[in-house]
């Protein structure tokens, strides 16, 4: 069973790319057409690549790995934090600090400092200090919490990273590639597919698109955790609320995909939807 449907992708606007003047020519193979100066991403390919990424994440986690969720742009911050937290994975949804991966030993020391300050605050360690000292320690704790709170329990570099917007997160992607850490990411029409190991062609600017695809990756993590625990295979299909009706041309895309599918709910991997 497919982990996400064409209808869910269309409802979330995953098929909308950037304006035709803002694109990376390397993305040409993932583009279906353009409409009103906007590139339309081939969602048949998106479905196929989602399956590949889902399987990789599930197997990685099932074998004891961790996935770091990265999305610092406003449209991704909430879903990245919520989905990573849901499955107990680390995340970065504020500013990426250079060296978070390549200089993790230093980052780990800052995490230890954060936990030390939290323990002091909770056990009365601030008592007996001047107001100025308490204010300084509180500010230090809050700053560390903002920048490192999402990775507080990350004891080592992750097995893979999930990225929303590889252009904005180019430092994170570069560090992962330098360390040989696989990158799973949304590829919008202005991105470079050569930087990503497991690409998912799609819209990385729309809140609902970023949320849907992040939820898919989190569901893969959840299924991997179930397998690791010996709980058997779970249903990783994300639940998406009904959206407003599709435009006529979007309905044609959906109809083409349905006709091409070998079975209900399956992913067609060889047929490109036809625009009417």
UniProtKB/Swiss-Prot annotation:
What CDD domains does this protein map onto? Answer: RPS2
Please list where the region (Disordered) is annotated: 254-276
Tell me which Gene Ontology terms the entry assigns under biological process. translation
What keywords does the record list, in alphabetical order? Answer: Ribonucleoprotein, Ribosomal protein
Q: Which InterPro entries match?
A: Ribosomal_uS2, Ribosomal_uS2_bac/mit/plastid, Ribosomal_uS2_CS, Ribosomal_uS2_flav_dom_sf
> Bias regions of kind Low complexity — which residues?
255-276
Gene3D superfamilies in the cross-refs: Glucose-6-phosphate isomerase like protein, domain 1, Helix hairpin bin
Kindly list the GO molecular function terms attached to this UniProt entry. structural constituent of ribosome
Task: Please provide, in alphabetical order, the Gene Ontology terms of the cellular component aspect for this entry.
Answer: cytosolic small ribosomal subunit
Hey, which family's this protein in? Answer: Belongs to the universal ribosomal protein uS2 family.
* HAMAP family xrefs: Ribosomal_uS2_B
What NCBIfam families does this protein's entry cite? rpsB_bact
Q: What is this protein called?
A: Small ribosomal subunit protein uS2
